[in-house]
Amino acid sequence: MSLIDMIFGKRQKSAAIARERLQIILAHERNGRHAPDYLPALQRELMEVISKYVSVNLEDIKVQVERQDDYEVLEVNIVLPEHQR
């Protein structure tokens, strides 16, 4: 909405304003989201699979999602015990 439109009374409909605000809120939430909801479950399942072969603690498995350009990158780091490397 331009300054002239605001002065002379041309108004957007409330539905259009609400939609615009919702799009802004959703964009901020998507950009501000640090960890997807599935990460804790993914970490537990990885622990179950890895523990079949190697003895590790849950704290030794780190799962992160990072944004690089237009892609989301899933990074998994597992600290293995010295004697099982």
From Swiss-Prot:
Keywords: Cell cycle, Cell division. It comes from the Bacteria. It holds the Pfam family MinE. One of its GO terms (biological process) is cell division. SUPFAM superfamilies: Cell division protein MinE topological specificity domain. The keyword Cell cycle applies. NCBIfam families: minE, PRK00296.1, PRK13989.1. Belongs to the MinE family. Prevents the cell division inhibition by proteins MinC and MinD at internal division sites while permitting inhibition at polar sites. This ensures cell division at the proper site by restricting the formation of a division septum at the midpoint of the long axis of the cell. This is Cell division topological specificity factor. It comes from Chromobacterium violaceum (strain ATCC 12472 / DSM 30191 / JCM 1249 / CCUG 213 / NBRC 12614 / NCIMB 9131 / NCTC 9757 / MK). The gene is minE.
